[in-house]
Regions:
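Conserved catalytic-core segments centered on acid/base and nucleophilic motifs
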Residues: 1-5, 86
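Context-gated lysine
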Residues: 2, 11-12, 42-47, 59, ...
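Trp/Gly-enriched beta-strand surface patches
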Residues: 4-72, 138-144
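Beta-sheet entry/capping signal
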Residues: 28, 37-38, 83-85, 161
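Beta-strand-rich interaction surfaces with strong enrichment in secreted/lumenal proteins
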Residues: 71-77, 150-151
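Short Pro-Gly-centered flexible turn/kink motifs
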Residues: 79-90
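Non-catalytic terminal regions with compositionally biased, polar/charged low complexity
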Residues: 89-173
């Protein structure tokens, strides 16, 4: 873990910090973790905290402590009609940060209880997280996607590169 977090460029590392940040299209929240990953939240309520954490050593099982910065989207327990939107940039370079505006790098195609569909404009990758059987609108690759399916595809030259999986572990309860 890391003991600091950047909130819109400002480094925070005071133990006991607790902040609630509302995010919107016009006022997105930008967070950077200690590993250089950036999180852009443009819909939702973001909570940030820096606390001392107690745990056990992985091998010795002796008590250990450390300072950890955490952030999460607070959407409540089983929200009705809840909504949030965020994007993660994995360790972007300085050039990428200067060249691209985060909100212009992706487009949400669908975001509802049936499916989340997002187009990564920079790479041309289309991604789907399907929760219920659905017929994607305005898609020339799929006419139907079954529930519990994750799909990503990218057109390369005259080929279609695709990754498909089910997040269901099929473990009987």
């Amino acid at each position: 873990g890391k003991d600091f977090i950047r909130i819109t460029g400002e480094k925070k590392q005071q133990i006991g910090l607790q902040q609630e940040l509302p995010a919107s299209d016009t006022q997105p929240v930008c967070l950077e973790d200690g590993c250089g990953n950036l999180y852009f939240v443009k819909d939702g309520k973001v909570k940030v905290q820096i606390t001392e954490q107690e745990s056990r050593h992985e091998k010795l099982r002796t008590p250990t402590t450390g300072t950890f910065a955490s952030a999460w989207i607070a959407h409540g327990t089983a929200p009705k009609d809840g909504s949030y939107e965020y994007m993660v940039w994995i360790q972007p370079s300085g050039k990428e940060l200067k060249t691209h505006v985060p909100a212009a790098t992706y487009k949400v195609i669908q975001r509802d209880r049936k499916m989340h569909a997002v187009n990564d404009i920079l790479t041309g990758t289309m991604a789907y997280a399907v929760f219920e059987d659905t017929k994607p609108a305005a898609d020339n690759v799929f006419s139907f996607l079954p529930a519990e399916t994750m799909v990503m595809y990218q057109k390369e030259n005259n080929a279609l590169v695709m990754s498909v999986c089910t997040p269901n572990l099929n473990i009987a309860e």
